[in-house]
From Swiss-Prot:
Belongs to the class-I aminoacyl-tRNA synthetase family. Keywords: Aminoacyl-tRNA synthetase, ATP-binding, Cytoplasm, Ligase, Metal-binding, Nucleotide-binding, Protein biosynthesis, Zinc. The keyword Protein biosynthesis applies. Binds 1 zinc ion per subunit. Its EC number is 6.1.1.16. This is Cysteine--tRNA ligase. Gene3D superfamilies: Cysteine-tRNA ligase, C-terminal anti-codon recognition domain, HUPs. It catalyses: tRNA(Cys) + L-cysteine + ATP = L-cysteinyl-tRNA(Cys) + AMP + diphosphate. PANTHER family: CYSTEINE--TRNA LIGASE, CYTOPLASMIC, CYSTEINYL-TRNA SYNTHETASE. One of its GO terms (biological process) is cysteinyl-tRNA aminoacylation. GO terms for cellular component: cytosol. The keyword Hydrolase does not apply. InterPro entries: Cys-tRNA-ligase, Cys-tRNA-synt_Ia_DALR, Cys-tRNA/MSH_ligase, Rossmann-like_a/b/a_fold, tRNA-synt_1_cat_dom, tRNAsynth_Ia_anticodon-bd.
Length: 499
């Protein structure tokens, strides 16, 4: 069986065939850099990191491009709040993004263009759309004429005529009144007083969000790419609009495969900054959740399915990782005792191509692993293979840790070295690598005062009921500083985890 991927565009799980044999071009929508990344971002970028690692492992040459949106209303708002420039906010959060992704073992993209660095390509693309009649300008703004693009809605399945009927009777604001159609969207926004702006044929202003990605895809990878990635929340309007812009300009298909990951849910709601129910990657790591525990937690669910963030789920992942980590570290810690050659870690960003073992059993296990990931990146199935592979290795590690000398003689008969080498190889495809012994947790977290936490949770609940969200956020931040992370659940309940 070859790799099969669920294509949002066709709504089918299809065999993957790249445009150019042996080469794969991938574009992934990046973050708007106004704040720290939360667990939802980790879910997305870990899923796509595994896709990239797997393709490389299977022998493909992969070009992976991921953008930064470094000019946006949210960035401007945050800059005003902090009384600093848009550039300062962007630079701070780009650096924080790299730190978070590096901590999680996510390979850095081959190229990471920024919107402000691609303005020539953006202006050129808008000009082409206007010249073809697919866009129109109004007093310094430029809009895409949705009704001129007959394929609009093919990704999301939305019927514009039906939605227009449902929208009839709405009171239009000033911008809506300027549009030819309510679903038309901005390609270029005229300058506003006090905001950064850039020159253009339509006057000073800045690009719309959607046009940025279309321009960067074309500039970095060409007019048609193999795979376009993003979260399910981007299907409409962002990715729908990307398709409309790009295909109206080039007359060619933008991407052959569209993959979308499911959301992280907290208390039955999508984790998001707008809802205030998010937990940053940094907070989780600082509070003692290991990077590999987070990877395992995320990969135990299929990338397209919703992922529920609960204390129980994190604790279960931590337990699972403890055993897997013991097996992965076996050959490094006990290489001399077992007379095994030391397994040196691969350089950052290096993925070895798959290589068959001289053991038939190992080759069967490798094939089970391949079968799982070939099935639309079934990471939970691949992890199950790792746990089966690790079982005797974990048992050996535990015996050696207890000083059981008989284990060495028995191991020689079992010939576990190829099994361990295979475990390290396959785990690397999922970005799972043995961690060094964890440092002791800060003293503040050694004793958890549960009564104090419950009182704080009760006070926070009262504050939220009174719509005093500032106080509720303050309580959450104070507990976070003490190493306690709150997790809101359905029914107004709140769980917590501690490092």
């Amino acid at each position: 069986m070859s790799l099969r991927l669920t294509n949002t565009l066709t709504r089918r799980t299809e065999p993957f065939t790249p445009l150019k044999d042996g080469h794969v071009s991938i574009y992934c929508c990046g973050v708007t850099v106004y704040d720290l990344c939360h667990l939802g971002h980790a879910r997305s970028y870990i899923a796509w990191d595994v896709l990239r690692r797997y393709l490389i492992w299977r022998g493909y040459t992969v070009t992976f491009v991921q953008n930064f949106t470094d000019i946006d209303d949210k960035i401007l708002k945050r800059a005003a709040e902090k009384e600093c420039s848009m550039q300062e906010i962007s630079e701070q959060n780009i650096e924080a993004f790299h730190q978070d992704m590096d901590s999680l073992g996510i390979l850095r993209p081959d190229r990471m263009p920024r919107a402000t660095q691609c303005l020539d390509g953006i202006r050129s693309l808008i000009g082409e759309l206007e010249a073809s009649g697919a866009a129109y300008s109004v007093d310094g703004d430029v809009y895409f004429a949705v009704m001129k693009h007959h394929g609009y809605g093919k990704l999301s399945g939305r019927d514009l005529n039906e939605q227009q009927q449902n929208a009839d009777g709405r009171v239009a604001d000033a911008e809506e009144a300027r549009k030819q159609h309510s679903f038309d969207f901005a390609l270029w926004k005229g300058a506003k007083s006090g905001e950064p702006s850039f020159p253009s044929p339509w006057g000073a202003g800045r690009p719309g969000w959607h046009i940025e990605c279309s321009a960067m895809v074309r500039e970095e990878l060409g007019e048609t790419i193999d795979i376009h990635l993003g979260g399910a929340d981007l299907i409409f309007p962002h990715h729908e609009n990307e398709i409309a812009q790009s295909e109206a300009a080039t007359g060619k298909q933008l991407a052959r495969y569209w993959l979308h990951n499911g959301m992280v849910n907290v208390g039955g709601q999508k984790m998001s900054k707008s809802l205030g129910n998010f937990t940053t990657i940094r907070a989780l790591l600082e509070n003692g959740v290991s990077p590999m525990t987070l990877r395992l937690f995320i990969l135990q669910a299929h990338y397209r399915k919703p992922l529920d963030f609960t204390a129980d789920a994190i604790n279960a992942a931590a337990t699972g990782w403890k055993g897997l980590n013991a097996a992965l570290g076996l050959g490094n810690i006990y290489s001399e005792t077992l007379n095994w050659p030391e397994c040196k870690p691969l350089p950052q960003g290096v993925i070895q191509a798959a290589h068959p073992s001289n053991q038939e059993q190992c080759n069967k296990i490798r094939q089970h692993f391949i079968d799982a990931l070939d099935d639309d990146l079934n990471s939970s199935g691949a992890i199950a293979v790792l746990f089966d592979l690790a079982r005797p290795l974990r048992a050996l590690a535990n015996r050696l840790k207890r000083g059981d000398t008989k284990a060495i003689q028995e191991t020689a008969k079992l010939n576990l070295l190829p099994r361990w080498q295979l475990l390290v190889e396959l785990a690397n495809v999922l970005g799972l690598e043995a961690e060094k012994a964890a440092q002791p947790a800060p003293e503040r977290n050694n004793r958890v005062d549960e009564n104090h936490i419950q009182r704080a949770i009760a006070t926070r609940k009262e504050a939220k009921a009174a719509r005093d969200f500032a106080k509720a956020d303050l309580i959450r931040d104070e507990l976070r500083a003490q190493g306690i992370e709150l997790i809101d659940k359905p029914g107004g309940l709140t769980d917590w985890i501690s490092s």
